[in-house]
Amino acid sequence: MTLRTHIATTADGVQLAWTRTGRGPTLVKASNWMTHLREDVDSPVWGHWTRFLSTHFDYVRFDERGCGLSDRQVEDVSERHWLGDLETVIEAAAITRPMALLGISQGGASCLRYAIAHPERVSHLILYGGYARGGLVRGGRHAEHHRAILEMVRLGWGNQNPMFRQVFTARFVPQGTHEQLDWFNELCRRTVAPEMALRLLEVRSRTDIVDLLPQVRVPTLVLHARDDEVIPVAEGRRLASAIPDAEFVELESPIHVLLAHEPAWREFERAVREFTGVARDEARPQGESPLTPRERRLLDLLREGKTNAQIAAAVFISEKTVRNHLSSVYRKLGVANRAQAIVKAGARAEAGTAED
């Protein structure tokens, strides 16, 4: 993959490195911990993300201030710059049509702020492993854990001995191979200086945008690994329940950065493709529209015999929204009611064609 990097300069003079790969509808990924434009392409941790997104989208990404190929020595890395930095890159990329935004981990906060400020420019909002409250804001055990991580970063990030960084790496990719763990350890060292790593983590730990979530007015897909050790799945559910009509997909994984070999990664790919409307399943019967991840989840709950109230509680939406989604499911399946939908779903599952 040919990588051409560009530089965009922010209002306060920080130079941000960004790149563009692939063809298709535009998708912009906000910066997240931690990336390096040049290293990520062939990375055993981030490479499959880049390949997937570049295959289906005009994919724009950038390194955040203080990291990677962007300016490494920066005075101000406060949260107030997250929106402005994203706006700077989007302007530099000369994106004129509505685009999809992808926010991974704390990148979700940047995307949420952008979607609220510029709803007319956002066609789809995708949040993976995101949160509205940083570790210190969540309090209790989460705050204690986060303080311990900050102390380890302060003591050992820059050491040649990777012991301290390995603790950090093990949280992000707990089931990684030796190659993946070694690569992530080295990424930590090469991407960000010790002092900057501590500053960036401290800023993230104090994030609190809970009050902004009801202001989102764009189609939103929230995905989260069920046993994520970095950001608890409860934070993903909080996002989905507070953002109006957001879809929520819970992935069977303990890994914050999904790895290529995981079934959860394939589910992530499928959910993103279907949510954004790219690369529809060619094997789908003619005339049958694809179900969204949420619609598939509702159909599964129907087959379990759940009532509308029970479904609403399970996926954190109102009963009215459940009825609206079920009407869409019936229409797409070509059935008239709940009973027919259950029969149709059962037949599809037995035939091995249920949305696969």
Tell where the protein language model's regions lie, with residue ranges.
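Catalytic active-site module of serine/aspartate enzymes centered on a nucleophile-bearing elbow/loop
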Residues: 246-286
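Helix-turn-helix DNA-binding segment
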Residues: 281-327, 332, 340-356
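Conserved HGGG/HGGXW glycine-rich cap/lid loop of the alpha/beta-hydrolase fold
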Residues: 7-69
